[in-house]
Amino acid sequence: MGRRVRPFAEQDYTAYARIASIAQGERINAAEARATDARWDPTRYDRLRVVAVDEEDAPLGYGEIRQEPSRVDPRRYFIRLGVDPASRRRGIGAAIWERLATELGKRRAEVACLWAFDATACQTFITKRGFVEVTRTYAQVRAIASAPLPTPALEERVTSTGIQITTLAAVRDALGEDALEPVWELHSACRLDHAALGRATPQPFAEWLSDNVTDAAALPDAYFVALDGARYVGVSSVRRDGEDTLRIGITGVLPGYRRRGIARLLTVRVHAWAKAHGSSEIHTETTKESTAMLALNDSLGYPIVASWGGYELRLGG
């Protein structure tokens, strides 16, 4: 029968997780992949995954197109594609891409996009097929031992204007579950300015709740929010990213409250929490368009340790 591309099936999870771990540069096991897929809502977002298999039906690579829940656009599809290193340069990736391109055509997709590291097989593969870099993300890391902490002067600068800093946990304790939706709305509003591949749209409330409240990695007592009276105006969200490592999800301030030191105070409050709880590092990611955030991170001693490009292919033209 030879090599062929077929729909992804239940028996493919182990091989898929192994190949995806290599292709995506992060450890993925079959159980995690199943759990992630179980949370996908096919009634709201389209997704297709295929695998290339050998004569014995063993996966050699995979491909996926999907609508991104955090950047909903019915004509924009995000792509994932990976081939087992032992099977590369045999036309397998090309066969997978041909199948994905056909499926994109059926859906009348206008844009295909993905992230790719520099000088990788993936980058070479996609640029040969017309994908163009349109944005770039920078990974930044701060050692907690020497990280700046809140100062009386900074606290006074912010609080003297009526701004108060608290946490998601404290707000929830004080106001109950009804307090969660306004914080989610703030998170959604701040994301609108975070340029990347496509226009940001609100993360579904259930996903935000899992990420920041109920998940094992969630840290509601390190999720800092700024309030002007009863109005939520700034946020810096954090999750566990390892035994002693944290990851900032988003730091943002509503437009009318910027350039007042709020984002800086939120960030150094995170530093103080991390230091008090024995964390060694904080990781974050920022796109090149977010010049103000890059400048803030630079002033707080976050070096850029890696970067990768965001690529798009315009379809149908």
Positions of the model-derived regions?
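A mid-sequence, solvent-exposed acidic-amphipathic segment
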Residues: 197-230, 235
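Short amphipathic alpha-helix that is part of the acyltransferase structural core
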Residues: 1-39, 45, 51-54, 58, ...
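Conserved acetyl-CoA-binding loop-helix of GNAT-fold acetyltransferases
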Residues: 89-102, 253, 259-272, 295, ...
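Acyl-donor-binding surface of acyltransferase catalytic domains
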Residues: 69, 85-175, 309-313
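Active-site/acyl-donor-binding loops of N-acyltransferases
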Residues: 129-149, 222, 272, 277-317
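Conserved donor-binding loop and adjoining core beta-sheet/short helix segment
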Residues: 10-13, 20-118, 227-228, 232-249, ...
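Polar/charged side chains located within well-ordered beta-strands of beta-rich proteins
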Residues: 20, 49, 97, 140, ...
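Extended hydrophobic/aromatic segments used for targeting, binding, or gating
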Residues: 233-251, 259-269, 273-283
